[in-house]
UniProtKB/Swiss-Prot annotation:
UniProt GO BP: nodulation; response to abscisic acid
PTM text: Nitrated in effective nodules and particularly in hypoxic conditions; this mechanism may play a protective role in the symbiosis by buffering toxic peroxynitrite NO(2)(-). Nitration level decrease during nodule senescence. Phosphorylation at Ser-45 disrupts the molecular environment of its porphyrin ring oxygen binding pocket, thus leading to a reduced oxygen consumption and to the delivery of oxygen O(2) to symbiosomes.
UniProt domain Globin: residue ranges: 2-144
Compartment(s) of residence: Cytoplasm, Cytosol; Nucleus
Binding residues annotated for O2, in chain numbering: H62
Protein name: Leghemoglobin-1
Subunit structure comment from the entry: Monomer.
Main location: cytoplasm
Residues that bear Phosphoserine: S45
GO cellular component: cytosol; nucleus
Tissue specificity annotation: Root nodules.
Length: 144
């Protein structure tokens, strides 16, 4: 069974909830990542020289890009059944030394952030849709 129209709609609608407070959710997202993988801090140019996770234009832009890429993955999975990356998105992850465990940490942070943004709209079905979309993106990044 492919990615369904309902799954795509769930990802799209909840990604809009993230956009309602991107500063707060961006800080939450990276805080969760660094709690789980403190050494990942050096992989992010906008975090490596800071004392902690603080809101900044670069942090917010990167978080919005990550969540946007997962949303775009949902669209691609629904349309074609696979995720194809644009440009250098895959190679930059290889250059930064991103390994399989990092993808697991980011997935967990992504789901916790969307859960927070979704509030009472959160469900197992919503979680599953984000997981499938993220896994499709992660697979494409690893294959690049």
């Amino acid at each position: 069974m492919g990615f369904t129209e309902k799954q795509e709609a769930l990802v799209n609608s909840s990604s809009q909830l993230f956009k309602q407070n991107p500063s707060n959710y961006s800080v939450l997202f990276y805080t969760i990542i660094l709690q789980k993988a403190p050494t990942a801090k050096a992989m992010f140019s906008f975090l490596k020289d800071s004392a902690g996770v603080v809101d900044s234009p670069k942090l917010g832009a990167h978080a919005e890009k990550v969540f946007g890429m997962v949303r775009d993955s949902a669209v691609q999975l629904r349309a074609t059944g696979e995720v194809v990356l644009d440009g250098k998105d895959g190679s930059i992850h290889i250059q930064k030394g991103v390994l399989d465990p990092h993808f697991v940490v980011v997935k967990e942070a992504l789901l916790k952030t969307i859960k927070e943004a979704s509030g009472d709209k959160w469900s197992e079905e919503l979680s599953a849709a984000w997981e499938v979309a993220y896994d499709g993106l992660a697979t494409a990044i690893k294959a690049a």
